[in-house]
Amino acid sequence: VSIVTKANIMKKTDGDFLQICREVAEEYPEIETDNWFVDIMAANLVNKDIRNQFQVFLLPNLYGDIITDEAAQIQGGVGTAGSANIGRDYALFEAIHGSAPRMVEEGIEGYANPASLMKAAAMMLAHIGYVEKAERLEKALDAADAKLGPKMTGLPGGGTCREFADEVLAAL
C-alpha cells in the first residue's frame, strides 16, 4: 500500500493523514506500506519502467482525483476506467469520470464510451464473489477495446456506445 500525500508542504492536513495511515498500518504488520509525495508519484506513474511496482494507493480525495485520472490515461483514458469505493458495510462501483451529462446536453450521448461503467461492473462482480464472471467480462472488454478502442473518441464520427457494447456481447 502506497500512501500518497504532500505532507512536506501541507503539514497539518496531509501530515495528519499520513500519521493516521501509519498508525493504522501498525495494526496490519503483514501489509507492506510506503509513502510518497504526490508529485513524485505522478512522475513515477509515467515512468513505464517502475509504475508496475505499485499496487494499492491510499490518498486524500484531491490527489486521488489527479492520480487516478493520470493512471486511467496510461491505460486508455478516463473513459475506460472503472472505480470502486469499498467500505465495511457498503460498496459503490461507478465510472471514474462520472455520468458525463455534457454529452447529453450536446446530443452526443450515443458516442459515450461504456467501457468505464462495464469495468466498474466487473469490479462489482469480483467483489460480490463472481470472480470468474468478472474475469470473462474483463476479457470481453479487452477484446472490444482491441477492435474499437482507437475509434472510441466520444465525438461524432467515432465509435458508438452501441458498437462497443455489441463487441463486448459478441466476445462474451
Predicted regions located by residue number:
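Glycine-rich phosphate/diphosphate-binding loop of Rossmann-like nucleotide-binding domains
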Residues: 1-39
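A short beta-alpha structural unit
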Residues: 7-9, 40-46, 122
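Glycine-rich phosphate/pyrophosphate-binding loop and the adjoining helix
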Residues: 7-9, 131, 140-172
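Hydrophobic alpha-helical scaffolding
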Residues: 7-11, 32-35, 56-57, 110-111, ...
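Conserved structured core elements
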Residues: 15-18, 35-39, 61, 115, ...
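A glycine- and small/hydrophobic-rich beta-loop-beta segment
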Residues: 33, 38-54, 171
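Glycine-rich phosphate/nucleotide-binding loop
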Residues: 45-148
